[in-house]
From Swiss-Prot:
<keyword id="KW-0812">Transmembrane</keyword>
<feature type="domain" description="Cadherin 1">
    <location>
        <begin position="64"/>
        <end position="148"/>
    </location>
</feature>
<keyword id="KW-0732">Signal</keyword>
<feature type="repeat" description="Desmoglein repeat 3">
    <location>
        <begin position="999"/>
        <end position="1039"/>
    </location>
</feature>
<dbReference type="InterPro" id="IPR015919">
    <property type="entry name" value="Cadherin-like_sf"/>
</dbReference>
<dbReference type="Pfam" id="PF00028">
    <property type="entry name" value="Cadherin"/>
</dbReference>
<dbReference type="GO" id="GO:0060027">
    <property type="term" value="P:convergent extension involved in gastrulation"/>
</dbReference>
<dbReference type="Pfam" id="PF01049">
    <property type="entry name" value="CADH_Y-type_LIR"/>
</dbReference>
<protein>
    <recommendedName>
        <fullName>Desmoglein-2.1</fullName>
    </recommendedName>
</protein>
<keyword id="KW-0472">Membrane</keyword>
<keyword id="KW-1003">Cell membrane</keyword>
<feature type="transmembrane region" description="Helical">
    <location>
        <begin position="644"/>
        <end position="664"/>
    </location>
</feature>
<feature type="glycosylation site" description="N-linked (GlcNAc...) asparagine">
    <location>
        <position position="115"/>
    </location>
</feature>
<dbReference type="GO" id="GO:0005737">
    <property type="term" value="C:cytoplasm"/>
</dbReference>
<feature type="repeat" description="Desmoglein repeat 2">
    <location>
        <begin position="975"/>
        <end position="998"/>
    </location>
</feature>
<dbReference type="InterPro" id="IPR002126">
    <property type="entry name" value="Cadherin-like_dom"/>
</dbReference>
<feature type="propeptide">
    <location>
        <begin position="19"/>
        <end position="38"/>
    </location>
</feature>
Length: 1142
């Protein structure tokens, strides 16, 4: 809130400001000049012109007060127009007294006011005071009369409305403006030619039209005498007169006329000739657009016989015949000729019903003028011998003149009718050259009968099909008709015939013969429209017909009006081949009129009954459209009103509301999964919390194999150290060690999660690995299939039921192994040579044998061999090392006694893999040489459990974690299958992709495997060779493991004796798809090299994984990369120790 200023403070502020300004004023006053008062002795007066003021002593007096104040004498003078300027010395001043007087007579028209300056000087010439202004105004007298200047002639259009400005007068008064002396009043005192006053003059000098009946054709120029009086016409004023000329401009207010009546004649079959000339008469100014005529044919020329054009020099209409007229068709023609001007008509022209129109009478009466024009028309009607004049008016108010044209008949020669003769013939009809197929005589056009004094010849016959009788015109076939003839045009053969008269000069007519091989004239011509509209001021309608048949069975048509059922009198004229002009000769009242019409085609075919044509006569508008309201035929219609528009808008809004409601509905749905804010890694584990499934019998089935470009493949994947993480079980000891692994793969959100189980000596080890690779290409169509569920529940049932007491326990470190020799990894093997368990496999194995072999096979149980003493452990530790290495560049890994190993792995790109399992058991020297392949039985997979009885000595085949069930093959079928061998000699065979071989034996010859046992030079996939035995010595494997394309190959060898294990090499060619090769060697005793040869690998497209080689017993071990993890699996009755490997 603003604070109020106290009165004391306000007073002090005002007092200070007033003293400040007073001091400043005093300071300025001390330096400024003092102003002296001046005095006008006699004020100036108004002087009237033409008055003599020279006799007066003075008219004004000037004096300065300096003269009294300083007691000095001053001298006065004048300056300005009338003093020291032209006119000189009209005003003079006494230099001593300051009296001003005039020396002449003033004239206001010359100078209306004088502005003088009085000067006061001291006697020494110095300025006594500033100049004094002296103004003398001259009063006006009415001493000047109005004066007319030069005036150009004015102009106005005839028939202009009242008040139309024509011109402005050039008249002025020299007296003072705004004074009554200069105010002028005008009036017309005379008009030539005399008559009604056509114009008037306003006080503002405007000449305007006073009468709207200006007619240039009557008077084209007016001369007016105008009087101008000042003092607004009051008495005593001055006056003057002037002459004004006004010209009347021409407008097209008169309709041009044609003389008459007009009649002409034309010759038939004549064209491009001038028929007649029609003189156009016009009252307008010659040579203008209002005068030049523009004639046109308003009616009677629907067929287009005539045309008309204007001759600009003579203003005549020239009627031309453009198309020949046939006397037999048309004998006379009545044309309606309309005439207009180039310039449009004035609005006053209204078809002769007003005074500005012209009546067209005959010779009995002339054309009236003005409003009496209508009488001229009546005079024309009653005059003797007068013509018809204008017989009708057009819809635009223009009269129509009748021109009657007679058609003269000319002697004509014969003529073929129709012009094209169609003769239908069937192609398969029997040919007879003497048979007359048709007659085509010429017609005498004058008599309408067949011509007699003529002969017929062929003019054109391309393929010589026809012969014609030269006297009768009979036509015969000269050869059989051929539908495939090249001379046919659309299935028709054309030939031309001439008819020549025998008199002099001879006349010729040409006719066309059309032989139709297939088409027939089976359609009659019909009217396109059965309803036509005719204006009351017209007398003809156009009627068009059509025919479905092709020429010559169609047009030209012949139209005929049947009198029965037809109202009124009508005639037919032809416009073209398909259209005719129906002209009435009576005045038709508005309303419907019916006509019965017959239409005949070129071959004379017409419909059985006449066709009805309805002509609706109505009053037409200026645009030519039919005004239904004038005939009383107005039809009720409907239109869209505001209410309907509003409903449409509401409907559109409702339609827009539906998508909005749908959007609101989607907002209430459950949202998408939220992304994890961290890398899940091992947090997302396969917990397998689904619980145990229902116990059911699971049949053994053979999964279907798919074939692609890479060979036999299946959807199951099981690769050793190739595609995913792999686990390995290794048995060492004097007895038989069994090893295998099981790998399962699942997908979650585009990533792969792998679980591997290792089965070694009735113990289970798990190695879970999470893979973030995109497996969309490898696992297309795999999502919890029946095979997957079967495998899953089988594992669970085996773990829960068969190995409930042998759950693995994983520890980071459990110390060193036990020094007691009796406690070892092989102390629980018991009798591994006992094959009695094969007799107790149960009905499930029998079912499997029946499916795979096709018949039951009896295998006698051999006598149990004595168990050899368990070998004494050579080392006091065993080691399980798992290492995964990603190799980006191929290189060499050197060890003391192990050759260089190059390992690379590429992701397999195949979408499917075929897997075959081979079980080879060596207990007898006998070889099964003839095993018949059994048919494959495909059964719908069902979830099942694998119930396996705990047998320490049982060797299980490593089974893949497939989406479908595996199959045991116990035969030696063709390639891509394994073999079952019992005996000492092992036959070589080729393993395809996905095949695995397990050899179990205790003795035998020195050579366990022949050369080339594992050879896949051109096949892709994975191969596994597991050799478990106790060969005393000798060469175990000789040969080469070769690889051509992508896949993985593995060799695992367990031996308890010395000797040369592997001689040869593992070769790998150029791998474009990637893969891995793994070789595992375990030796209990040193003595010879573990590996002789090398594992060679060519180029690999991507890096793979390397499993290190482990040598035991004197050999140095070098691991290319530090192990990522160490896990020791400890089971009951087994001691496993670990020790770091350097």
């Amino acid at each position: 809130m603003a604070r109020r200023i106290s009165p004391v403070v306000a007073f002090l502020l005002c007092f200070g400001l007033s003293h400040f300004f007073e001091a400043e004023a005093r300071l300025q006053h001390s330096v400024a000049l003092h102003r002296q008062k001046r005095e006008w002795i006699v004020p100036p007066q108004i002087l009237e012109e033409n008055v003599d003021y020279t006799k007066k002593d003075f008219i004004a007096k000037i004096r300065s007060d300096k003269e009294v104040a300083h007691m000095k004498y001053l001298r006065y003078s004048l300056r300005g127009v009338g003093a020291d300027q032209e006119p000189f010395n009209l005003f003079v001043v006494n230099p001593e007294t300051g009296y001003v007087r005039i020396t002449g007579i003033l004239d206001r028209e010359s100078i209306s006011q004088y502005n003088l300056s009085g000067i006061a000087l001291f006697t020494d010439g110095s300025i006594a005071e500033n100049d004094i202004g002296l103004r003398i105004k001259v009063k006006d007298q009415n001493d000047n009369a109005p004066v007319f200047g030069v005036m150009n002639p004015g102009a106005v259009d005839e028939l202009s409305a009242v008040g139309t400005e024509v011109m402005r007068l050039n008249c002025f008064d020299a007296d003072e403006p705004g004074n009554p002396n200069s105010q002028i009043k005008y009036e017309i005192v005379d008009q030539q030619p005399a008559g009604q006053s056509m114009f008037t003059v306003e006080n503002n000098r405007r000449v305007v039209v006073a009468n709207p009946n200006l007619d240039r054709e009557t008077v084209d120029q007016y001369v007016l005498l105008v009087k101008a009086s000042d003092l607004n016409g009051a008495p005593g004023g001055n006056a003057a007169t002037g002459t004004v000329t006004i010209k009347i401009n021409d407008v097209n207010d008169n309709v041009p006329t044609l003389g008459g009546p007009y009649e002409a004649s034309i010759e038939e079959n004549t064209e491009k000739v001038e028929v007649m000339r029609l003189k156009v008469s016009d009252l307008h100014l010659k040579g203008t657009d209002n005068w030049e005529g523009d004639c046109y044919i308003a009616s009677g020329n629907e067929a287009g016989y005539f045309s008309i054009h204007m001759d600009p020099k003579t203003n005549e209409a020239v009627l031309m015949l453009d198309k020949a007229v046939d006397y037999e068709d048309v004998k006379d023609l009545n044309l309606g000729i309309g005439v207009a001007n180039k310039a449009p008509f004035h609005p006053s022209v209204s078809g002769g019903s007003q005074g500005a129109t012209i009546s067209f009478g005959g010779s009995g009466g002339g054309a009236g003028s003005g409003a009496a024009g209508g009488a001229g028309a009546m005079g024309g009607a009653s005059g003797s011998g007068g013509g018809t004049g204008a017989s009708s008016w057009s819809s635009s108010g223009v009269p129509l003149y009748n021109v009657n044209i007679k058609v003269k008949n000319q002697p004509e020669g014969p003529k073929f009718f129709p012009g094209t003769k169609a003769i239908p013939i069937s192609e398969g009809k029997a040919f007879d050259s003497t048979e007359i197929i048709a007659r085509y005589p010429a017609i005498d056009t004058d008599t309408g009968k067949e011509a007699t004094n003529v002969k017929y010849i062929k003019s054109s016959d391309p393929d010589n099909w026809l012969t014609i009788d030269e006297k009768t015109g009979a036509i015969r076939m000269n050869k059989a008709p051929d539908r495939e003839s090249k001379y046919l045009v659309n299935g028709t053969y054309y030939a031309k015939v001439l008819s020549i008269t025998q008199d002099l000069p001879s006349k010729t007519a040409t006719g066309t013969i059309a032989i139709q091989v297939e088409d027939f004239n089976d359609h009659c011509p019909t009217l396109i429209s059965n309803v036509q509209t005719l204006c009351t001021d017209k007398d003809a309608v156009l009627v068009t017909a059509k025919d479905e048949d092709a020429p010559p069975n169609g047009a030209p048509f012949d139209f005929n009006i049947v009198s029965e059922g037809t109202a009124g009198k009508w005639t037919v004229e032809y416009m073209n081949d398909t259209t005719a002009i129906f002209r009435t000769h009576e005045k038709l009242w508005p309303g419907p009129h019916e006509l019965m019409v017959e239409v005949t085609d070129q071959q004379g075919l017409k419909c059985p009954e006449p066709q009805k044509l309805q002509v609706d006569v109505c009053t037409c508008k200026n645009q030519g459209g039919c005004d239904r309201t004038a005939t009383g035929d107005a039809k009720k219609g409907s239109r869209l009103g505001p209410a309907g528009i509003g409903l449409l808008l509401l409907a559109l809004l409702a339609l827009l509301l539906i998508p909005l409601l749908l959007l609101l509905c989607t907002c209430g749905m459950t949202g998408a999964f939220t992304d994890m804010p961290f890398e899940t890694k091992v947090h997302l584990i396969s917990s397998n919390t689904e619980g145990q499934g229902e116990d059911r019998d699971v049949p053994l089935m053979c999964p279907p194999s798919n074939v692609d470009g890479m060979g036999f493949m299946t959807k199951d994947y099981m690769a050793v150290g190739a595609m995913h993480s792999a686990g390995l079980g290794l048995g060492v000891g004097a007895g038989v060690g069994a090893a295998g692994f099981l790998e399962s793969t699942s997908t979650m959100g585009g990533r792969g999660y792998n679980e591997m189980e290792l089965d070694y000596m009735n113990s289970i080890g798990r190695n879970n690995a999470y893979s973030s690779r995109d497996m969309a290409g490898d696992f297309d169509g795999m999502a919890l299939s029946d095979g997957y569920l079967c495998e899953y529940y089988s594992q669970k049932s085996r773990v829960v039921d068969g190995f409930g007491k042998d759950d693995p326990m994983v520890y980071d470190y459990e110390g060193k192994g036990s020094p007691v020799g009796s406690v070892g990894c092989c102390s629980l093997l018991e009798d591994q040579n006992d094959l009695e368990f094969l007799n107790d496999l149960g009905p499930k194995f029998t079912t499997l044998a029946d499916i795979c072999g096709g018949k039951k096979t009896e295998i006698p149980a051999p006598a149990p061999a004595p168990l050899p003493p368990p070998p004494k452990p050579v080392v006091d530790r065993s080691e399980v090392v798992s290492s995964t290495t990603n190799i980006l560049n191929t290189g060499n890994i050197a060890t003391n006694r192990v050759n260089t190993v190059n390992v690379a792995s590429n992701m397999a790109t195949a979408s499917s893999t075929r897997v075959e399992n081979v079980l080879v058991t060596d207990n007898r020297p006998t070889m099964i040489t003839s095993v018949h392949p059994a048919p494959t039985l495909l059964v719908q997979p069902q979830p099942m459990y694998y119930m396996v009885e705990q047998q320490p000595s049982t060797v299980l085949v490593a089974e893949r974690p497939a989406m479908t069930q595996g199959m045991y093959v116990l035969n030696s079928g063709p390639v891509a299958e394994g073999m079952v061998v019992q005996g000492g000699n092992i036959a070589a065979n080729t393993l395809t992709r996905g095949e695995r071989m397990v050899l179990v034996f205790r003795g035998g010859p020195a050579q366990a495997l022949n050369n080339g046992m594992l050879h896949t030079s051109n096949l892709s996939g994975s191969q596994l060779l597991l050799v478990d035995g106790g060969a005393t010595s000798g060469q175990v494997l000789q040969g080469t493991i070769q690889r051509g394309v992508a896949g993985s190959q593995g060799l695992m060898f367990v031996d308890g004796q010395g000797g040369q294990v592997i001689q040869g090499s593992i070769n790998n060619g150029i791998s474009t798809h990637g893969g891995s090769q793994n070789v595992f060697y375990v030796e209990n005793k040193g003595g010879s090299s573990v590996v002789q040869g090398g594992l060679q690998m060519g180029k690999a497209s991507t890096a793979g994984s390397l499993i290190g080689d482990v040598g035991i017993g004197g050999s140095s071990v070098k691991i290319t990369q530090n192990p990522s993890s160490h896990k020791v699996v400890v089971q009951e009755r087994k001691v496993v120790t670990t020790q770091s490997v350097k």
